[in-house]
Design a protein with these regions (language model features):
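Residue-level signature of the cytosolic catalytic core of signaling kinases
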Residues: 13-16, 36, 40, 93, ...
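Aromatic- and glycine-rich peptidoglycan recognition patches
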Residues: 10, 73-77, 94-137
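Intrinsically disordered, low-complexity
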Residues: 1-31, 78, 125-137
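Generic alpha-helical structural context detector
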Residues: 22, 49-53, 111, 131
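Catalytic cysteine-centered active-site loop
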Residues: 30-82
């Protein structure tokens, strides 16, 4: 029997991860501002909070609090996936989570980095600098 492909004019619904990443990518170039969650400036947890709000996942506006939610990912033995939240230490206090970004692959993330910086895509921190990885989607 001959199989014919059925084409549809309706585009596929983007995955929840794609919705989060598309929102985060749209913020690239906007300035970092402590305590802000958009629409014109963000701090690190404000960016993750707003991106995940697009898929009805509610996150607190603090990286340490966000790091206690979702499912833990063992980043040393399994790959970080797009949509995972990646948490790092402060350079000032090596025992305190103080930064978060959204992985877009196993090697890159989107982050609102620091005062004077802008939302950007950059290389994921090395495994030794990562303190937690959490999966929400």
């Amino acid at each position: 029997a001959k199989v014919t492909a059925v084409s549809s004019s309706t585009p596929a619904t983007p995955s929840r991860v794609q919705v989060v990443l598309d929102f985060a990518r749209a913020q690239i170039g906007k300035p970092y501002e402590f305590g802000k969650a958009g629409p014109t400036s963000y701090d690190c947890s404000g960016l993750t909070l707003k991106a995940f709000a697009q898929v009805k996942v509610s996150l607190p506006h603090q990286s340490l609090a966000q790091s206690k939610l979702g499912s833990a990912v063992d980043w040393k033995s399994s790959a970080i996936q797009a949509g995972d939240l990646v948490f790092t230490f402060s350079s000032l206090n090596m025992s305190q989570i103080s930064h978060v970004g959204i992985a877009i692959s196993s090697t890159q993330w989107i982050e609102a980095p620091y005062t004077g910086g802008v939302v950007r895509i950059s290389a994921l921190p090395s495994a030794s600098k990562i303190q937690a990885v959490r999966r929400f989607l």
